[in-house]
Amino acid sequence: MPSRKHLANAIRALSMDGVQKANSGHPGAPMGMADIAEVLWRGHLNHNPSNPEWADRDRFVLSNGHGSMLIYSLLHLSGYELSIDDLKNFRQLHSKTPGHPEYGYAPGIETTTGPLGQGITNAVGMAMAEKALAAQFNKEGHDIVDHFTYVFMGDGCLMEGISHEACSLAGTLGLGKLIAFWDDNGISIDGHVEGWFSDDTPKRFEAYGWHVIPAVDGHNAEAINAAIEAAKADPRPTLICTKTIIGFGSPNKSGSHDCHGAPLGAEEIAAAREFLGWEHPAFEIPADVYAEWDAKAAGAAKEAAWNAKFDAYAAAYPAEAAEFKRRVNGELPAQWEEKANQIIADLQANPANIASRKASQNALEAFGKMLPEFMGGSADLAPSNLTMWSGSKSLEASDFSGNYIHYGVREFGMTAIMNGIALHGGFVPYGATFLMFMEYARNAMRMAALMKVQNIQVYTHDSIGLGEDGPTHQPVEQIASLRLTPNMSTWRPCDQVESAVAWKLAIERKDGPSALIFSRQNLAQQPRSAEQVADIAKGGYILKDSDGKPELILIATGSEVELAVKAAEQLTAEGKKVRVVSMPATDAFDKQDAAYRESVLPSDVTARIAIEAGIADFWYKYVGFDGRIIGMTTFGESAPADQLFEMFGFTVENVVNTAKELLA
């Protein structure tokens, strides 16, 4: 029977061979962490390679995602549908083994990692979801939600600020099922880290309230195993500090940055094989090694045992069992569509001139009563973002049965934690901050879009309408940057009806994130027919039309729709034929068929004006070079909002005069 070291060496061999064949990649971390991975995956990780979606599996996250050959090797050896040919195709076009682990490619990859610090933060979200789902569904004698979240991370993850945001909150919330392994190898791309990373990491994590196990020999299986056992027994999140040698097994490059991010080279790989006693050719794993690694039988037995537990739970609590299945499968409640549409119709029939942030809260109130899977939150701005509703109950370390997370001032951490919650399953996460501060969180929203996971962000205080707080808090280019992100759905509604439609579609959207952008100031509700209400979902629609063919089209979003309508009324009174198009979601409009887009924006009507209190340049796509844009070309100013709108040209007079110049 192969020794544990020999089993770990299988990871080392596959990792150095995969990087060498691709002629790019990072062999150092996989070779350094192979012993830890062998102990965790063969001795502790509850998973089933034949069903990577098993609801109560342990989650494993490789936060130092550049070491991707580590997880690819583990998945292959354990029996997942990842062949040796897939490993040979490492970093190649359309392979299941891209340079950094990507969710949705290889089975068993729980999240896309690579931007350092986000993996550990996703893992915090997964651990929060596990604890909340357990609190909501487990009954005495029936622990149907009971799994750990394990994460590997390196020095780079800990240097990134997001690791502070996430790990601080994890300690506060007592996430005892979260176990992190710090790959303390002292090396980063630039060399030995003591010149730029001299933190006392164990004390840092003790200060967060974590259980810290220091100075574990990362190449000693017994020490690693003992640390994991101690971690599992402690009610706090655990940091296991593993001292490792980067590139372990490479005689001439281990312990240095030379093996961090480049192939070892054929000569050094041969030397490593000799040093490790690994006598097999590249990509060849002997049968006895495969046999020891294969987790399919054990995984199937573990899942079968859980299925029996769930059957007993379902017999005792049939309603809860059905609800658990619905939520884990990501299905919306029965009659959702009918009830949601009625809510929207009622809003149209009962006009209210309110801020769209208040309209958002009203939508939460209406929809939330149907959605126990809601998991809300805000980055310490709940009274401003209006993200709490009557059914909101805050999560606390001692009581995780609620549905609202106080993230504190942690925009980046919040957004990446929400990605983890969404990836775990069982919840529809929403979070919030001022639109300006989405900048802190932009990369986590990009990751949500890349992974195609549901992440609903409420961004309030959406323009110079914020007023006196000034340009540090007034967004200008942020809406455009969200719209330009692939697979991001971005909504800027003009009233309570568009706001409710935006919320409904964000709740229904399972294949990507949604940015819902709301105003601080009150907005007038617009009259609409039932057909117009239905057309809101198309992202752009005719709100007010001319008698006969229009000679001018005004396109507006959010708070500027009311302005466009008033300007159109004045122009119409002067004999102009003016159409007003409300375009709350350009991405949704762009997805409509050509016939619909042409019906809203006829190509032969070139006199067009776009009006939005955001960066002007975005709108040339819709108005053309012959059109005009009333938008922002500079940062804002500190002053009352009404003065700012006048100063920057968001007035009926300016729209009317611009229209007359265009039509002259």
Swiss-Prot record:
Q: Where does thiamine diphosphate bind?
A: 66, 114-116, 156, 185, 260, 437
Magnesium as UniProt keyword = yes
Q: Which GO terms describe its biological process?
A: pentose-phosphate shunt
Q: What SUPFAM superfamilies is this protein classified in?
A: Thiamin diphosphate-binding fold (THDP-binding) (SSF52518), TK C-terminal domain-like (SSF52922)
Gene Ontology terms, MF aspect: metal ion binding; transketolase activity
Q: Name one GO cellular component term.
A: cytosol
In this UniProt entry, which residues are annotated as the site Important for catalytic activity? 26, 260
Q: Which domain of life is it from?
A: Bacteria
Q: Which UniProt keywords apply?
A: Calcium, Magnesium, Metal-binding, Thiamine pyrophosphate, Transferase
What residues form the catalytic site here?
Answer: 411
- Annotated substrate binding sites: 26, 260, 357, 384, 461, 469, 520
**Entry binding sites for Mg(2+):** 155, 185, 187
Enzyme Commission number = 2.2.1.1
Q: How is the cofactor bound?
A: Binds 1 Mg(2+) ion per subunit. Can also utilize other divalent metal cations, such as Ca(2+), Mn(2+) and Co(2+).
The protein's required cofactors: Mg(2+); Ca(2+); Mn(2+); Co(2+)
Which chemical reaction does it catalyze?
D-sedoheptulose 7-phosphate + D-glyceraldehyde 3-phosphate = aldehydo-D-ribose 5-phosphate + D-xylulose 5-phosphate
Query: How is the subunit organization of this protein annotated in UniProt?
Result: Homodimer.
Instruction: State its role.
Output: Catalyzes the transfer of a two-carbon ketol group from a ketose donor to an aldose acceptor, via a covalent intermediate with the cofactor thiamine pyrophosphate.
Q: What is the protein's given name?
A: Transketolase 1
Q: Which organism is it from?
A: Vibrio vulnificus (strain YJ016)
| Gene that encodes it | tkt1
